[in-house]
Curated annotation (Swiss-Prot):
Species, as recorded: Homo sapiens
InterPro entries (alphabetical): Ccdc54 (IPR037758)
Residues in coiled coil: 93-151
UniProt-recorded name of the protein: Coiled-coil domain-containing protein 54
Organism domain of life: Eukaryota
PANTHER family: COILED-COIL DOMAIN-CONTAINING PROTEIN 54
Residues modified to Phosphothreonine: 182
């Protein structure tokens, strides 16, 4: 804007200068022509007539007009000088404004460069983010494929012979645990029943002991066998099926002990069919081990319970004291 303004001012000054110069030149030319005509008139010697008198009057008027013309030239020069001074005073102001606008333009250019750099960085970040998103999508698809075609790490029921072998091994592992638990329960019952029913004889022979214990042992064997069959009837597997069928299914079997298995939803039907096809085998009759009654078992047990209760009370008291100290 200010460059255009300066150009316009310069053009106006040139026009004024040229117009004033043209006026001065025209006035000078007129004066020169008049002087030349007067000089030609003065060189000749014509006869004096009325026309000559008129010419003399005109020359006198020309002489009188010369100072007026010069005065006009001076005034025009003064005006031109004042206008030129005004233009000269205006030029530094315009220059200052142009400098200010140039500085502002430089600041704007720097800001534009900064914005361009930011845009470049943002575009680079966006491109890197797009690449990361693509890589993540690929990984997600790979994980989905792996989940769809994955193998079971906890327990894998395979098709064919290997699956059958693994299930048989699991069944064999479950059976000894159930037998151990039933044996432990029978031992506890025998130890609790013997001191009540079997009388303590002072130093009796082995033959008499066998005769006295044999009917009791038979009854205990029958009872244990019945209890074991009842426990097998009562112990039913708890099947927890999650709502999402793509997830694993937790099976807990309570046969004397908790056995948990994780199966896929696709293999659940095969596992249930295998369980239904297997015959229900009752555990073998446990071997009863005779234990002699000790008269010191009762007081020893009572003393141990008393000591444990005292220890628990002391421990609880110490814990409560620690909590109070920490609060304080």
């Amino acid at each position: 804007m200010y460059t255009l303004h300066t150009k316009r001012v310069k053009a106006a000054a040139r026009q004024m200068w040229t117009s004033n110069l043209s006026k001065v030149r025209q006035s000078l030319k007129n004066v020169y022509h008049k002087c030349k005509i007067r000089h030609q008139d003065s060189t000749g010697y014509p006869t004096v007539t009325s026309d000559d008198c008129n010419q003399d009057d005109d020359s006198y008027d020309g002489k009188m007009n010369l100072p007026v013309v010069l005065q006009d030239v001076k005034t025009a020069q003064v005006e031109l000088f004042s206008q030129m001074t005004d233009i000269v005073h205006m030029i530094p102001k315009v220059q200052e404004k142009t400098d200010l606008y140039q500085k502002q333009m430089e600041v704007l250019e720097t800001r534009m460069n900064v914005n361009e750099d930011k845009q470049c960085t943002t575009t680079k970040d966006i491109l890197s983010m797009k690449e990361d998103i693509k890589a993540l999508k690929k990984k997600v698809t790979e994980l989905e494929i792996q989940n769809s075609c994955s193998t079971i790490h906890c327990l894998e029921i395979l098709e064919g012979e290997r699956g059958k072998e693994i299930t048989e091994l699991l069944y064999k592992l479950i059976q000894p645990a159930t037998l151990k638990n039933t044996l432990a329960s029978t031992d506890m019952e025998i130890s609790s029943a013997e001191p009540e029913k079997v009388p303590s004889y002072p130093k009796s022979t082995d033959h008499l002991e066998k005769k006295t214990i044999s009917p009791q042992m038979k009854t205990l064997k029958k009872r244990n066998h019945q209890n074991a069959s009842r426990s097998f009837e009562k112990a039913k597997p708890n099947i927890y099926i999650y709502p999402d069928f793509s997830t694993w299914i937790k099976l807990t079997f309570v046969h004397g002990g908790k056995w948990t298995f994780f199966l896929s939803a696709t293999k659940l039907e095969e596992f249930i069919q295998w369980l239904l096809s297997r015959p229900t085998i009752l555990p073998e009759e446990p071997q009863v081990i005779t234990q002699r009654y000790c008269p010191f078992t009762g007081p020893i047990l009572s003393l141990t319970t008393i000591c444990l209760s005292i220890f628990n009370n002391i421990y609880g008291f110490i814990c409560s004291l620690k909590e109070e100290v920490t609060r304080l």
